[in-house]
Amino acid sequence: MSRFFSIEVAKDYFNFASAHFLIFPDGQREPLHGHNYQVSVTLEGEIDHAGVVLDFITFKPLVKQVCDALDHRTLIQTESPIIKVNRRGQEIEVRYKTQRLLLPRQDVILLPLVNTSTELLAEHVADQIRREVRKKFPHARIRSMEVGVEEARGQRGMFRGEF
């Protein structure tokens, strides 16, 4: 019989407050606005000799660190074919049709995404967590990860992928 184990972390302090905008399928841009995002993470894998997939005490700070990197920033997608993003010294310029947004560089996180949807933000958070877990816990035997990014109560994007 196969045995499957997982851990889930979903703490109130796994959050980030960020501004963003989406480009809709028809090419329209929604207004710049913000959310107080909440993050949850589930890891599935084999348990180690101590009987754990990964120790909560050492894993939680890693998730918090990933959330903190996005906190109080404007999230800009750099892979959208609809907008143009230019780095100009201490500023980030975003062009959409005839509109121009100019933001201080230190207030922006440029993300290699086509959009800043909760689904793609969940994948980005998962990628960051995966990189850090592999670095800090190289012997962990994790098979898959699921990340949820909630932008409003009961409204969340999910990503699930192999580890």
What label would you give each PLM region?
Residues 1-163:
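Charge-rich, low-complexity N-terminal segments
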